[in-house]
């Protein structure tokens, strides 16, 4: 059935221009359907695109127009988000469920159409309703128009998509988390949909991802973390990497033997096959904070780098394993991200030195009483439900309309307000370890409420945001993803942000441009950007349980003074919520 489906579903590429020529149109058809997959002795029904896990790679050249027809054959509504694509003046195609559009109903179709402008590198796409992105995802590759890279041209590029294998129904998982149940865990990490040979059931060993290489050649590994819960360490035994890009932007080349990638991030690394021809294991390993934070199982997957000239049995020798950090040691992630800088080139945008609006956002957790109670026993009792917060506000998603529609129509009443708090209600020691586990002090600091509070900006405003992770209830890192924008990551640090001390650390010369900003565990991150893309843009943590719990808001960017700086009307293929 899947084979016949793939034969009838044409993934067409129309008028794709030759390198250096005119921009073309890249067209795909995504058929979203159910598929049974057996892992660890159990068969699970999952949702996939075109019979593939991960889904098809969208491969375009800078300047192309992308057209994707999505056919929904599953019993749930869904949208497709083009993670990291700027969507300049095409906010209607962003694909954020109930933010820019209502979901595509079962049995219906929708077309996404947008241009890829001034971006080169690795992004990705994924479902953006409930937990469906676990299996509905794929790489989105943007190649330079002139065919030239600011690093040695690889012989091949390979997506390395890190994910997780869930046996639990993903819609049920979403429902359970919204009800405050966070005891469910995936069974394994995956590399390109494969669990790897460290997983087995009744002696049946799971299949591993295999990367075949030729000695002396270089490979561009496009490492993407699609997981729900964890940052991942990625290593290949006997090999080193040169990090050259992240989130669709070039980086100053940085040599390392390990990559750390948080949920939502895409990291480009060059790997030269310069080891003695043999077989070498690759490992992805999830990290997590140590106790007293709540603990999760060890998520790991093992793949293989196989030299084509090597003996099939590796000359009878054991296959080398990379030495991985302790999973409870999160500092390698901090140092990896802190060592990255942007590559200066003629098209690299300059950091805004003047700031019009400053925002200070505390990322934390809070509790509210269940049901309609006004008072209840707090501190993780059965009377409360835990929520993720930004400045003590937990975001409430609309489920019958889309925020962009209401903004465009000028009818926000009863749906959202524009009073998102730009600073926390009270200052405190945000990274005090005594706040873990919860006690009486948290009850004073974390009063929380649910609301749909947005922030409005005028066009061409220079914005600075300090994201501060807190230790309220636990000490997670927070990968914050802003739709529609790349932001300058000026600095990251540990502890509570202190402006007098920490502003001296800001990198104004060659900061990274990122769409997903990892705010360190017990630390902070400072970003700046110019509001030059009108529309409704979702800001949220990319840990699935954090977004479901409410660590989100949306930014409204007003129109500029000209049609070229304004949000156009919905395109003909756009389906309004009342017509979905």
Swiss-Prot record:
Q: Which InterPro entries match?
A: Cu-oxidase-like_N, Cu-oxidase_2nd, Cu-oxidase_C, Cu-oxidase_fam, Cu_oxidase_CS, Cu_oxidase_Cu_BS, Cupredoxin, CuRO_1_LCC
* Domain Plastocyanin-like: residue ranges: 31-147, 156-310, 419-561
Per the UniProt entry, the signal peptide is: 1-23
Keywords assigned by UniProt, alphabetized: Apoplast, Copper, Glycoprotein, Lignin degradation, Metal-binding, Oxidoreductase, Repeat, Secreted, Signal
Indicate what this protein is called per its UniProt record.
Answer: Laccase-20
| Cellular location(s) | Secreted, Extracellular space, Apoplast
**What detail does the entry give on cofactor binding?**
Binds 4 Cu cations per monomer.
Give GO terms for biological process.
lignin catabolic process
Protein species of origin: Oryza sativa subsp. indica (Rice)
């Amino acid at each position: 059935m899947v084979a016949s489906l793939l034969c009838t579903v044409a993934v067409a590429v129309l008028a794709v221009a030759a390198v250096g020529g005119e921009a073309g149109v890249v067209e795909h058809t995504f058929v979203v359907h159910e598929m049974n997959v057996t892992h660890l002795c159990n068969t699970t029904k999952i949702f996939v695109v075109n019979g593939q896990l991960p889904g098809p790679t969208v491969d375009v050249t800078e300047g192309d127009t992308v057209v994707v027809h999505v056919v929904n054959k599953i019993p749930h509504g869904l949208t497709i988000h083009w993670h990291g694509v700027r969507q300049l003046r095409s906010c209607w195609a962003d694909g954020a469920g109930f933010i820019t559009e209502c979901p595509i109903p079962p049995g219906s179709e929708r077309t996404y159409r947008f241009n890829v402008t001034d971006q080169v590198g690795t992004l990705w796409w994924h479902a953006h309703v409930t937990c469906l992105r676990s299996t509905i995802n794929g790489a989105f590759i943007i190649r330079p128009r002139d065919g030239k890279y600011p690093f040695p041209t690889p012989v091949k590029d390979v997506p390395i998509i890190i994910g997780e294998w869930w046996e639990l129904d993903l819609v049920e998982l979403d429902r359970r988390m919204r009800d405050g149940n966070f005891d469910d865990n995936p069974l394994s990490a995956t590399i390109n949909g494969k669990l790897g040979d460290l997983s087995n059931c009744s002696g049946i060993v799971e299949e591993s991802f295999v990367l075949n290489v030729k000695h002396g050649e270089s490979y561009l590994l496009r490492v993407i973390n699609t997981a729900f819960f964890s940052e991942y360490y990625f290593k290949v035994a006997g090999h080193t990497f040169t990090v050259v890009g992240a989130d669709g932007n070039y980086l100053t080349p940085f040599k390392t033997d390990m990559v750390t990638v948080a949920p939502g991030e895409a990291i480009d690394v060059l790997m030269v096959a310069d080891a003695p021809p043999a077989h070498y294991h690759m490992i992805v390993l999830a990290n997590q904070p140590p106790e007293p934070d709540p603990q999760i199982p060890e998520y790991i997957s093992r793949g293989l780098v196989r030299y084509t000239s090597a003996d099939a049995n590796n000359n009878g020798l054991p296959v080398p394993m990379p030495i991985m950090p302790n999973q409870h040691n999160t500092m390698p992630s901090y140092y990896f991200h802190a060592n990255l800088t942007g590559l200066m080139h003629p098209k690299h945008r300059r950091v805004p030195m003047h700031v019009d609006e400053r925002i200070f956002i505390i990322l934390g957790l809070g509790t509210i009483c269940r049901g309609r109670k006004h008072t209840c026993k707090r501190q993780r009792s059965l009377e409360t439900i835990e929520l993720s917060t930004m400045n003590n506000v937990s975001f409430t998603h609309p489920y019958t309309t889309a925020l962009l529609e209401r903004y465009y129509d000028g009818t926000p009443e009863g749906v959202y307000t524009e009073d998102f708090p730009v600073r926390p209600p009270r200052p405190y020691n945000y990274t005090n370890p005594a706040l873990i586990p919860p006690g009486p002090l948290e009850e004073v600091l974390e009063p929380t409420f649910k609301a749909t509070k947005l922030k409005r900006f005028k066009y061409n405003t220079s914005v600075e945001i300090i994201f501060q992770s807190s230790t309220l209830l636990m000490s997670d890192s927070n990968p914050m993803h802003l739709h529609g924008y790349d932001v300058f990551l000026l600095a990251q640090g540990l502890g509570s942000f202190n402006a007098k001390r920490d502003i001296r650390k800001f990198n104004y010369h060659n900061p990274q441009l990122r769409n997903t900003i990892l705010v360190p565990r017990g630390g902070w991150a400072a970003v700046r950007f110019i509001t030059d893309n009108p529309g409704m843009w979702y800001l949220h943590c990319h840990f699935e349980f954090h977004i479901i719990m409410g660590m989100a808001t949306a930014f409204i960017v007003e129109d500029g003074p000209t049609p070229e700086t304004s949000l156009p009307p919905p395109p003909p293929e756009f389906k309004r919520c009342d017509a979905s």
